[in-house]
């Protein structure tokens, strides 16, 4: 039953028969907030159809319409700290539209270690100017955990000396309108804070006094980031769960929407990796992991369980320690 439901979701767009746009007073064309939330939660991509190939593509037209009546785009300062840069790589893999359209039409990227052209002192000067000129307006995106031991790591150098991740995040976090922790390291510590955590890495929320919106994942799905940014732009703060993650994307467990749920309910568990039955016996932590991977998919192609490998719970606050050993059944994991 659930398997058939999942197949139907992939083959039929839930938005073919509803009106997405509303003409508001003043001639503005905006996506209603309720419809935006439904879009984020339910949109099923069609890999072979550019018109339905990704959530980012679907949202972009609405964001562009919004910008037509606005004077500015959403200002963003993107800071990389103790991370592997996997999240910006994941976002670069968004298939349609490509990253350049997101950067040009949705946000005003004021600073980014990866995407900016400036370097050295010019880059630092740009950062200082952006932070001061856009104070209380910009969204701070932090990718990576914050190392606390000896205030390491260094994220940039000024004429006055080195600036650590801790110093930079505290400075920029105090000026930002919103703070988004991008990836599990920034959200909860993640692999950077895994045992024995010699760098004493911490989540962004542990070093700031303001609210932090956690967009966890190792790496994040591009849709989770694009959708969160679009919500901040058009509607402000999204509804968050008890871990400060947007319920748009982290509202339900992997287990609830998994295409193999019927196998679990009937007690049919895989005996080896690569088999088609439920992966619970092979270490899957889907029952405690909140994300919409079963129908969101990755790069509009696939997701781990459909590729015959267990979910390792990369969006969880206790990842990776709470998921190891990866191929041990959930009740037997050391820290679950």
Predicted regions, residues:
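Intrinsically disordered, low-complexity segments enriched in serine/proline and basic residues
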Residues: 2-3
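Short, Lys/Arg-enriched N-terminal segments with co-localized hydrophobic residues
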Residues: 12-29
């Amino acid at each position: 039953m659930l398997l058939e439901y999942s197949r139907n979701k992939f083959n039929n767009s839930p938005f073919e028969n509803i009106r997405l746009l509303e003409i508001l007073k003043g001639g503005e064309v905006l996506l209603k907030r309720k419809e935006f939330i439904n879009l984020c939660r339910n949109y099923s991509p069609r890999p072979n159809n550019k018109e339905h190939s990704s959530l980012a593509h679907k949202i972009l037209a609405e964001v562009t319409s919004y910008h037509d009546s606005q004077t500015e785009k959403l200002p963003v300062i993107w800071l990389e700290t103790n991370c592997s840069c996997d999240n910006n790589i994941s976002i670069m893999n968004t298939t349609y539209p490509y990253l350049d359209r997101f950067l040009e039409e949705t946000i005003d990227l004021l600073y980014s270690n990866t995407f900016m052209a400036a370097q050295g002192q010019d880059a630092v000067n740009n950062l200082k100017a952006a932070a001061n000129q856009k104070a209380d307006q910009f969204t701070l995106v932090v990718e990576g955990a914050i190392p606390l031991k000896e205030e390491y790591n260094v994220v940039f150098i000024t004429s006055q000396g080195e600036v650590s991740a801790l110093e930079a995040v505290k400075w920029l976090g105090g000026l930002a309108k919103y703070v988004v922790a991008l990836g599990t390291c920034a959200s909860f510590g993640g692999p950077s804070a895994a045992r024995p955590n010699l760098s004493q890495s911490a989540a962004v929320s542990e070093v700031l006094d303001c609210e932090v919106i956690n967009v966890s994942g190792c790496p994040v799905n591009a849709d989770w980031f694009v959708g969160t940014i679009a919500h901040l732009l058009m509607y402000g703060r999204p509804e968050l769960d008890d871990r400060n993650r947007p319920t748009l994307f982290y509202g339900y467990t992997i287990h609830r929407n998994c295409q193999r749920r019927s196998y679990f309910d009937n007690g049919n568990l895989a005996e080896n990796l690569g088999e088609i039955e439920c992966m619970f016996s092979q270490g899957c932590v889907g029952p405690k992991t909140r994300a919409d991977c079963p129908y969101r998919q990755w790069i509009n192609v696939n997701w781990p369980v459909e590729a015959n490998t267990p979910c390792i719970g990369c969006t969880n606050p206790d990842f990776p320690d709470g998921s190891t050993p990866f191929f041990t059944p959930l009740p037997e994991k050391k820290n679950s």
